[in-house]
């Protein structure tokens, strides 16, 4: 009977607590293997957190630094016009070109950068001598004005002053009492005739061009096309505007054969004659 009771007791179901204890005894090794996995993953999690923190800081600080940089730039002298220099001019003073830009040291370089073409056009409009103009920005606030000029071909005497004549035929409004002696003085030409005479003058050899002191629309001997050229070497040329471009090349050979100053007549033919009394007095 005792053996039967023991058999019955062994077949009784386990209580919940006994079941839990039995499971715990079966899984300790499995649990010990899982703990190291948690320890290995922990540094990776910390690294990811640090990266995320750095990324958030960059996203916050970068715009702030950019704003501070922009405000600092506009508050500094580097944001405004500094040194302005001119390249390419020979007859127009540099300061006159700079004044034509109407730039001041209070103007922002950013505004200059966006309006370079307009400023260049302002220079060309203010100074007829300037053929081309362009602005280049160097560094933070240095401006270089690169220019080219229309060639000066002579002067015309008007209103008690000598006014420059450009190769385009335009007569400048500004006059001077001391013209550059390397350029001839034109007189007697109409506004229509002056550009035509300039075109003829450009066809002369350079050495002869430099030796001309005056060009007069003399219109003598009933010839409306007659001109007179007074030369720096003391000779005078009488010619016709319709033929002078072809005949002017004979001038050096003619004067090389005579020792006396006089008139080189290229109007009809090509020859030398001495000054008449009236021509000599007017030439003196």
Swiss-Prot record:
Coiled coil found in the keyword field: no
Spans within the Extracellular topological domain: 78-284
Localization of this protein: Cell membrane
HAMAP family: DivIB (MF_00912)
Record's compositionally biased regions (Basic and acidic residues): 1-10
Lineage per the UniProt record: Bacteria, Bacillati, Bacillota, Bacilli, Lactobacillales
Keywords assigned: Cell cycle, Cell division, Cell membrane, Membrane, Transmembrane, Transmembrane helix
Top-level taxon in the UniProt lineage: Bacteria
Protein's UniProt name: Cell division protein DivIB
Gene designation per UniProt: divIB
Native source organism of the sequence: Lacticaseibacillus rhamnosus (strain ATCC 53103 / LMG 18243 / GG)
TM annotation in the entry: 57-77
């Amino acid at each position: 009977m005792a053996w039967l009771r023991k058999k019955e007791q062994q077949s009784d179901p386990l209580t919940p607590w006994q079941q839990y204890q039995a499971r715990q005894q079966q899984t300790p090794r499995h649990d010990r293997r899982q703990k190291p996995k948690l320890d290995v993953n922990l540094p990776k999690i910390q690294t990811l957190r640090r990266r995320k923190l750095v990324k958030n800081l960059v996203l916050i600080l970068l715009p702030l630094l950019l704003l501070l940089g922009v405000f600092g730039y506009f508050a500094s002298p580097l944001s405004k016009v500094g040194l302005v220099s001119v390249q390419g001019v020979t007859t127009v003073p540099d300061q006159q070109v700079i004044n034509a830009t109407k730039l001041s040291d209070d103007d922002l370089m950013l505004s200059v950068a966006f309006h370079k073409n307009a400023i260049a056009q302002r220079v060309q409009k203010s100074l007829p001598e300037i053929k081309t103009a362009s602005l280049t920005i160097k560094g933070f606030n240095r401006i270089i004005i690169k220019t080219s000029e229309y060639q000066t071909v002579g002067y015309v005497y008007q209103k008690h002053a000598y006014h420059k004549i450009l190769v385009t035929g335009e007569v400048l409004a500004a006059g001077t009492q001391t013209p550059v002696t390397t350029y001839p003085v034109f007189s007697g030409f109409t506004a229509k005739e002056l550009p035509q005479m300039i075109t003829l003058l450009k066809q002369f050899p350079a050495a002869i061009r430099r030796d001309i002191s005056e060009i007069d629309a003399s219109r003598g001997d009933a010839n409306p096309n007659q001109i007179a050229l007074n030369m720096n070497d003391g000779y005078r040329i009488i010619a016709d505007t319709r033929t002078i471009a072809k005949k002017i090349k004979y001038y050096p050979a003619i004067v090389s054969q005579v020792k006396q100053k006089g008139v080189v007549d290229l109007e009809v033919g090509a020859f030398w004659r001495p000054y008449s009394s009236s021509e000599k007095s007017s030439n003196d």
